[in-house]
Amino acid sequence: MKHFDIHSVNRSLETAIQAKIDNLNKPKGALGRLEEIAMQVSLIQESLTPSLAHPCHLLFGGDHGIEREGVSVSPREVTWQQMINFTHGGGGVNMFCRQHGFKLRIVDVGVDYDLSDVEGIIDRKIARGTKNFRYEAAMSEQEFDQAIHVGCEMADDCIAEGCGVLCVGEMGIANTSPSSIWMSLFGNIPLADCIGAGAGLDKPGIQHKYEVLSKALDNYRSQEPQPTPITPLRYFGGFEMIAAIGAMLRAAEQHLVVLIDGFIMTACAVAAIRLYPTAKDYMIFTHCGDESGHKRMLDMMGAKPLLHLGLRLGEGTGALCTYPLIDSAVRMINEMNNFDNARITKYF
C-alpha cells in the first residue's frame, strides 16, 4: 500500500488562535461548537485567518458482490442508475453541492455497468463490482492498491485547483454490509449491534443480513488467521470505499479540511484512522445519521457530530448539509470584531 506522511496538526499556534477567538466581542465560549470548529480549521491550515477555498466533493461509485446474497432491499442496478442520475444533476448530492458551492466529481471505481461513455463520469473502473465476500476476498491486494491510487488521484485533482475543504461520498448498493463488518472488527462490537436496515430492510431482512455477514466473518477468520492492517479492508471493502479512504488520507497529508459523512464514510474514516491515527486531526465528523450503529461508531473515536438530523441517504449529503456551520465558524474568526476595535469593555 502507498505510504502517507501525515503529521499531527501543529499546535504551536493554539494559544494565539484561542486568544483571538476569546477576544471576539462575545462572552468567552458563547459560540460553542463554532469556536471548536474554528480552532480545528485554523490548526489544520496553521493560520489565524483560515479559509474554505474551492470546496470540492468526490463521489465514488462501486458495486458489491455481497449484494448477490440479498442483504439490501435495493437492487444492484440502482448503483448505475443513480450514477447516471447524478450526471443530470438530479440527486440529493447535486442539490446540496449546488446550494453550497461545491464542485462535484463523479467517479466510477467499480460499478457493474459500462459507464465509460457517460459524460460527467470519470472512468477509473477497476472491475465490475467486487467479489462476494461471503466466500472470498472482495478484492486482491493489487486491486486494493489501485483503489487507493484512484482516491489519491482525485484528491490531487482537487488540490491542484486550490481546494481547501474536501467532502467525500459514495454510491454503492449493499455498502452498509462491509461497513457493519468493519465496525464490528475495529470496535470489537458484536456483529448484531452493528447491523441496521440500510436502505430499508424489515426485521426478517435484517436477520437474514446478520446471518449472511456472520457466515462471511467466520469464513474470513478461517481464511485469514494472521491478518495485516489492510486485510479486512480489501477482504470486505468496496472499490468506492477504498478510494474514499485514499482520498481522505491524501487530503489529510496535504492539510485539507476533510468532511466525514454518514455510516459508510464514517466506517471509511475509522479504517483510515486505524492505518494513520493522525489523520483524525483533519476530519470533521459532520452528523450522526439514522443508520443503526452510526452513533456507536462515532463514540468509538470520541467524535462529536455537529448535527443529528436522522439522515441515512449517504452520497455525502449529510456532510454537505453541515457545511454552512463550518463556514460560519470560519467567518466568525475572520469577520467578527474584537473588543478593542469595537470599543466594548472586556468584562471577563
Question: What residues fall within each predicted segment?
Answer:
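N-terminal loops that bind phosphate or other acidic moieties
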Residues: 1-348
